[in-house]
Amino acid sequence: MPLSYQRFRRLLLLDDEAGPLEEELPRLADEDLNRRVAEDLNLGNLNVSIPWTHKVGNFTGLYSSTVPVFNPHWKPPSFPNIHLHQDIIKKCEQFVGPLTVNEKRRLKLIMPARFYPNFTKYLPLDKGIKPYYPEHLVNHYFQTRHYLHTLWKAGVLYKRVSTHSASFCGSPYSWEQELQHGAESFHQQSSGILSRPPVGSSLQSKHQQSRLGLQSQQGHLARRQQGRSWSIRARVHPTARRPFGVEPSGSGHNANLASKSASCLYQSPVRTAAYPAVSTSENHSSSGHALELHNLPPNSARSQSERPVFPCWWLQFRDSKPCSDYYLSHIVNLLEDWGPCAEHGEHHIRIPRTPARVTGGVFLVDKNPHNTAESRLVVDFSQFSRGNYRVSWPKFAVPNLQSLTNLLSSNLSWLSLDVSAAFYHLPLHPAAMPHLLVGSSGLSRYVARLSSNSRIINHQHGILQNLHDSCSRNLYVSLLLLYKTFGWKLHLYSHPIILGFRKIPMGVGLSPFLLAQFTSAICSVVRRAFPHCLAFSYMDDVVLGAKSVQHLESLFTAVTNFLLSLGIHLNPNKTKRWGYSLNFMGYVIGCWGSLPQDHIIHKIKECFRKLPVHRPIDWKVCQRIVGLLGFAAPFTQCGYPALMPLYACIQSKQAFTFSPTYKAFLCKQYLNLYPVAEQRPGLCQVFADATPTGWGLVMGHQRMRGTFLAPLPIHTAELLAACFARSRSGANILGTDNSVVLSRKYTSFP
């Protein structure tokens, strides 16, 4: 007998008119049930020709693109000088005693973090800064460059100096100093690594390159650096086959040379390539000339001595003849000293071979929907999550609602800590740098996009004409406004640059995993140090709980001092005291249980207010509606099953038409939300088990068994056995050996 909606409803409400459960419940396994219930609910025929609705309230669906809003007054970010202490394990052991194996393993994962993708695709520098705001190209370019420069100054990025060297600011780690060690003997190295392959050759195997961070960088291969200057070696012709390791004598003279060429006043416009910190840098063929094409002749294979030297693009405007009212020399003449063409880092290290390319584009967006005054950098390293070579990121546990409630539902007083720039605490090994490159090709290449009459630089036609091609009202006005903000840095930011990540970036799937491991290990240490309190974390959200407010304040002081001693930066302005109701992960958790936060309840009410009936809604919009309603489903009487018709339409990528009955049913469900209570520990006395053809129960000394009319999928059979046990015994705790039943997420079975 088919199961009608009325019978289905009676069954849900355990009505007296319903037949015995053993006969009624197996009918729920009938595949046709959804269709019949849909018919009874007047959901109507889904295959109708009415055009689909692609927007419901704030939810947008297919074929809709949100136009990003550029804010020319975004506040530039400021990052503290974050340096997580390398001896973090030792410091934790001083604080709490010996660490557990689990804690040690997690902390070793991030000291340093390693990233070795199977395959890396390199993109041209023009794709470094994405043209995300076509109307504000120049403004966005400088804002992004400033953001990247700020990250480099804060020690988050390396700057590529040449194919095998990089500079950075901040305190070095030991694995970076190992690379930096210089003049001592090579006694640790095998002979295979001692003799370097010549400039321009690619004899090193792929394996050696990828393991450079672990193997060849551990010896004393890079040169020792004296007084922050990078010693300069004469460029070798590729056919000379001379190994890398030969140092010129007289490092003092070289240091002097470097510092001279670093000041880029117009009086000494000696610039050879994109990284003009050194006038004759090693391996130039792959480091610089690809960056500023107009500065070098086509025959770039010639030796350095033959190569003509051109002044820097920005300073060339100074004494040249004006071509119009918008000639850039009017801006360049505003300042006598435009500062250096490139800034130098405090430390230099040797890195694996890094091409003059990027592996991901960057752009700026609002920090979050509620904070449009500040900007956030978006880094697109999605190449590592796509295609045949995609990296399968490690999975990690996310606490579910019930376990959160069991753990945090108590009479404790709560506060939450905010870790500032949490991702940028965790250091990356330099061997990962060639895979995580961002940067830009310089302003001159960007200008080419702006003016339609500009040509890509042709050296036969002289440089001056090309300069005039750059002049346009749009560029002139933009630079004049930006001059007020950035001053002399306009010159610095107009040069090309390539930067690699020194700390874990946000755009890689590995980063959330590493951050979760790190904060959970730290909280584990804090819990053992203060056994009478509770510390819990999810990503960068750390909460502390204690019996009284006074107790909580002293705990807060002790934990803050401990975290600061490890080098973890907290944002004191964002520390929140919650009293006895903790706001965490979208829930409000108190001694009574958990409920969704008010802003989510408000969103649900708004969603129902704007939900149309008798109109086919695009499945993408349905997906967003289900995302919102699914979050609050555990707090409703019916739970997830109420959303099953929506799930089915999303899976089949069909439009869904809400009937007034179904909308009213959902409204009623979500109008009254019930708290999810903490599970009290108790004794289990009722057990259920099943096979595809039969079921069995044990209740104390009583046993029951039965068979199904037809063989069922095992998870369905186990679930039915658990339902029989609950209806027969009324017990709150059931024993089952099936993980699907235990998970209690019945929206889809394996």
Swiss-Prot record:
Q: Where is this region: Spacer?
A: 178-335
Q: Which InterPro entries match?
A: DNA/RNA_pol_sf, DNApol_viral_C, DNApol_viral_N, Rev_trsase/Diguanyl_cyclase, RT_dom, Viral_Replic_Matur_Polypro
Q: How is its activity regulated?
A: Activated by host HSP70 and HSP40 in vitro to be able to bind the epsilon loop of the pgRNA. Because deletion of the RNase H region renders the protein partly chaperone-independent, the chaperones may be needed indirectly to relieve occlusion of the RNA-binding site by this domain. Inhibited by several reverse-transcriptase inhibitors: Lamivudine, Adefovir and Entecavir.
Indicate which residues the UniProt annotation says bind Mg(2+).
Answer: 418, 540-541
Q: Where is this region: Disordered?
A: 186-229, 279-302
What ranges does the record give for the region RnaseH domain (RH), renumbered to this chain? 680-750
What are the boundaries of the region Terminal protein domain (TP)?
1-177
Which reaction(s) are listed as its catalytic activity? DNA(n) + a 2'-deoxyribonucleoside 5'-triphosphate = DNA(n+1) + diphosphate; Endonucleolytic cleavage to 5'-phosphomonoester
- Keyword set, alphabetical order: DNA replication, DNA-binding, DNA-directed DNA polymerase, Endonuclease, Hydrolase, Magnesium, Metal-binding, Multifunctional enzyme, Nuclease, Nucleotidyltransferase, RNA-directed DNA polymerase, Transferase
The UniProt record lists the EC number as 2.7.7.7, 2.7.7.49, 3.1.26.4
Q: What is known of its domains?
A: Terminal protein domain (TP) is hepadnavirus-specific. Spacer domain is highly variable and separates the TP and RT domains. Polymerase/reverse-transcriptase domain (RT) and ribonuclease H domain (RH) are similar to retrovirus reverse transcriptase/RNase H.
Q: Which additional comment does the entry carry?
A: Hepadnaviral virions contain probably just one P protein molecule per particle.
Q: Which family does it belong to?
A: Belongs to the hepadnaviridae P protein family.
Q: Which PANTHER family match?
A: PEPTIDASE A2 DOMAIN-CONTAINING PROTEIN-RELATED (PTHR33064:SF29), POL PROTEIN (PTHR33064)
Listed name of the protein:
Protein P
Q: Which species is the source of this protein?
A: Hepatitis B virus genotype D subtype adw (isolate United Kingdom/adyw/1979)
